Amino acid sequence: WDNLDGSIERGYAGKSIFKWEEIKLGKNGKGGSISKSLHDRLITYARANASLGINGSVLNNVNASPKMMTAEYINKVKVIANILRPYGIRVYLSINFASPMALGYTKTADPLDKKVQQWWKKKAKEIYATIPDFGGFLVKANSEGQPGPGDYHRTHADGANMLADAVKPYGGIIMWRSFVYGANHKGEDRVKQAVSEFKGMDGKFRDNVILQSKNGPLDFQPREPYAPIFDNIKQTPQIAELQITQEYLGQSKHLTYLAPMWKEFFGFVNPDRLVGISGVANIGDDANWCGHPFSQANWYAFGRLAWNPSLTAEEIAHEWLVQTYENQDEKFTKPVEMMMMTSREACVNYMMPLGLHHIFKFDHHYGPEPDGFIASYPLEWCPIYYHKADAQGVGFDRSSKGTDAVGQYPEPYRSLYDNIATCPEEYLLWFHHVAWDYKMKSGSTLWQELCMKYNMGVAMVEVYRDFWHTSAKQYMKGHEQEWQHTDSLLNVQLENAKEWRNTCLKYFQTFSKMKVYE
């Protein structure tokens, strides 16, 4: 989600690699030269992606600047496209839906306005004349303050189809995001709003429109059930959007390997039903690209799974590890692969176990804030809206007796999730408000289980830290700097895991009135 000023929304590895100021255009605004450092960086970026089978790159943030549609930036995009093309990578752009109005060419951005339609057709012609193999547009519309067709009482289909018609003659596509809440269905359970918004439009989109949806129905949480929009949209092609950058899973400070989470998603949504996979990248201009040395494994795993979703998370972890650290000694690879393979579950446990979700700090999203409430913010941004802790229990009732979010799932999941006795415990507090003394499958009460999960999460990070500090270094000859960096970050991760556990249990104890178990 790279911005034109070099910043990256939810980026944790430095600034953007797309340094627009280092691309100089000729006097006529065309042609262009590029700094050697940027050229070399982009070649390396292209080679890395091509080695994984990644075949496209959206160069800018979904919260897009209208400037992206100016001749200056289109000609700069051409310079990047020329570098990526030999590696089989097409460029795409995120657009601001109100671009023609924001740039002063029209008085409206209404997709049914003839002048607006004409502007986009001319703009598409200009882009494809400059970049003949341009891929198309990614659109975030009527979401979190972004403009869209809803501003003119038009539908998402109206907006997407207008853009689709503009790029259709050149083979372009429109990737329209379904991450929409707080607009037409304000007040409805946020996790239901994508289906409520788009189900009635299924089949009304042009054939070059693809609906792009996040893997879960909320927002890239450490664990969510799969998004039911993948079941409810049957005629419109779909892309799954995964978040490689660890916005909610420790950012670039935690060792959290995401392939197990993505494989979990593919266990519910068959990749064969999708026309593509997109990933919110975790790269920046840091020397190691991804901030945390092990975050590189997530970029690698995304590409490998997009190319071959039948691979196991274990296979990918092993591939990455032996290629990166050039050591196949099982005394090194086995424990480190164990760290990687258990790290996502550990993260869930020390942050938001048993189906808890969205209880992180405001704005930067790093660390816990279960008591979070700001009156001026939308309620669906506030942690207290999601855990609903009270003297009776904790959890969000999405059963048929609550918001009926379970009703958006097909059988057998609808009945499975609806019944507290059969709901998988990893989703329990996602779908149910559960009494503190509710008896879990282990025989413990919910409160005891919650304490145990938080403690397990912290204990796992202690295991990672201790092995890495005492045993890993001897196997990393030539990689001492990466060892030191990871060693330091594991200490940071452990302290943050303890903060999550202590803050959340102390807060929830004010409702449960029960002893905190250690």
Identify the residue ranges that each predicted region occupies.
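Catalytic-core regions of glycoside hydrolase
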Residues: 29-32, 105-318, 324-328
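Short amphipathic alpha-helical segments
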Residues: 38-41, 155, 312, 335
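Hydrophobic transmembrane alpha-helix bundles
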Residues: 41, 45, 93-104, 130-137, ...
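Catalytic domains of carbohydrate-active enzymes that cleave complex glycans
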Residues: 273-518
